[in-house]
Amino acid sequence: MRFAIVVTGPAYGTQQASSAFQFAQALIAEGHELSSVFFYREGVYNANQLTSPASDEFDLVRGWQQLNTQHGVALNICVAAALRRGVVDETEAGRLGLASSNLQTGFTLSGLGALAEASLTCDRVVQF
């Protein structure tokens, strides 16, 4: 079965993102296809490369990145939500005159069209 996940919670502070990550790992372990994860609202903080969790905590941002590199899962973040919350790639940083970018490698700024496409092409869309 083909799945897409929508994450609306930040990397730290709520269970939404960590539950979504554990669900994603379980899907892959059970042989399902996870085509994409769409980060929306506060979920865009999962793509901030400047997060620095304590050494005894799981690094969720890098966990998502590994999911992308090891399993080819597309990590799309809503561009409008990201810009409002200060998560930008190099292109947007340059366009906005910002000194630097902070989008973690493996994540892609995208519009709601990516979520709509996932909804149409997947068997299930699960929101956290």
Curated annotation (Swiss-Prot):
One of its GO terms (molecular function) is sulfurtransferase activity. The active site is at residue 78. GO terms for cellular component: sulfurtransferase complex. GO terms for biological process: tRNA wobble position uridine thiolation. Pfam families: DsrE. Keywords: Cytoplasm, Transferase, tRNA processing. It is found in: Cytoplasm. Its EC number is 2.8.1.-. Coiled coil: none annotated. HAMAP family: Thiourid_synth_D. Part of a sulfur-relay system required for 2-thiolation of 5-methylaminomethyl-2-thiouridine (mnm(5)s(2)U) at tRNA wobble positions. Accepts sulfur from TusA and transfers it in turn to TusE. Belongs to the DsrE/TusD family. This is Sulfurtransferase TusD. It comes from Escherichia fergusonii (strain ATCC 35469 / DSM 13698 / CCUG 18766 / IAM 14443 / JCM 21226 / LMG 7866 / NBRC 102419 / NCTC 12128 / CDC 0568-73).
